[in-house]
Amino acid sequence: MVYNILIVKYGEIGVKGKNRYIFENRLIRNIRNMLKPIGRFNVYKEYGRIYVDLEDYDYEEVIEEVRKVFGIVGVCPGVRAKKDYDTLKEIALKMLEEKIEAGYKTFKVESRRGDKSFGLTSQEMSMDIGGYLLSKVGDRINVDVRNPEVKIKCEYREFHTMVYSDTIPGYGGLPLGTNGRAMSLLSGGIDSPVATWMVAKRGMEVEAVHFHSYPFTSERSQEKVKDLAKILAKYCGRVRLHKVNILEIQKAIGENCNEEEATILSRRFMMRIAQRLSEKRHCDALITGESIGQVASQTIQGLTCTNAVVDLPVFRPLIAMDKSDIVDIAKKIGTFETSIVPEEDCCSVFSPRKPVTKPRLEKIEKSETALDIEKLVQDVIDKIEVEDIEF
């Protein structure tokens, strides 16, 4: 089948009321941006839908990119043709014959009459086209109106006809750039890239901050995080990566504070630095990959202590998810194989033998009085390295 158009289906955007056009226009822009590496495409809105003209491009390659755009729940390859009812029926027959060759046994026709001057109603169109198809291939396939293996969808519009069948699922969500911007604390593990992706799926642009302890952690570990940011950029567009060396902070904690509190104290510094960066970059929230009880610092008491040093909302989309579910998403979005490459991070290098699991905020705050917090924070901020990551 020679497809010449994609029908883009969106979900939540359809119930946005008076603001719907804002989301639609952003979605169109995001689709165009996603397709730039392939070519220049005509992406437009018509009859309350979004379409992509395929021209001579490989439809499978284009669909694979379009389905990554947040806000899209499905993409349908279709054939758009001149406004002629007999032509519509011939295209429907050709499409059904391909489905028969692929092994399908039952079908149903669904029709939409966009041109009200046409002599048949939508239901009458379905019956007529279905009868025509049965007369041609009824010995090889049966009708099943309740649970068909194949749906042949036919539309008779004011200026053209259209036939399509398959729907390739998208990721849903809202168009990137419609819900502000967030700063993600991006490590090299499995969780934080998934958390970043999930928040971006709700329409937030994302930047990332990565904490390292070079030379105690290797340059390879930083390259690994860049690779993860590059994968995320496939979905999120450009990702600005802020690389922060907190070695001096960790040394100060080790010299002046209780060993068991080192992880919580380090996390509090990370949150402070992330908030400072967020204020500078006009980010509205922080993102972390934390999940209740997954590690010692992620108990409810630990999260309370880390939250206490920031004013921005902290989004933790993985908070109640099982590890297996997080891994499934990581595999789906393509970050898993990179995340499991063994490299030490700044937390594991200075991990205490017996970290405190139920820290008390007042005790942690008292421990911090031994540190010059403002100087330590400002010193590392002054040395931040910034890189824009694009796919």
Swiss-Prot record:
Annotated metabolic or biological route of this protein: Cofactor biosynthesis; thiamine diphosphate biosynthesis
Domain of life according to the entry: Bacteria
Keyword S-adenosyl-L-methionine: no
Residues at which ATP binds: 185-186, 210-211, 267, 289, 298
Top EC category: transferase
Gene Ontology MF annotations: ATP binding; CCA tRNA nucleotidyltransferase activity; tRNA binding; tRNA-uracil-4 sulfurtransferase activity
Cellular component GO terms, alphabetical: cytosol
UniProt main location, coarse: cytoplasm
Biological processes, Gene Ontology terms: thiamine biosynthetic process; thiamine diphosphate biosynthetic process; thiazole biosynthetic process; tRNA 4-thiouridine biosynthesis
EC number: 2.8.1.4
Database matches in Pfam families: ThiI, ThiI_fer, THUMP
Keywords: ATP-binding, Cytoplasm, Nucleotide-binding, RNA-binding, Thiamine biosynthesis, Transferase, tRNA-binding
Role: Catalyzes the ATP-dependent transfer of a sulfur to tRNA to produce 4-thiouridine in position 8 of tRNAs, which functions as a near-UV photosensor. Also catalyzes the transfer of sulfur to the sulfur carrier protein ThiS, forming ThiS-thiocarboxylate. This is a step in the synthesis of thiazole, in the thiamine biosynthesis pathway. The sulfur is donated as persulfide by IscS.
HAMAP family per UniProt: ThiI
The family this protein is said to belong to: Belongs to the ThiI family.
Name of the protein this chain belongs to: Probable tRNA sulfurtransferase
Upper classification of the organism: Bacteria, Bacillati, Bacillota, Clostridia, Peptostreptococcales
Gene: thiI
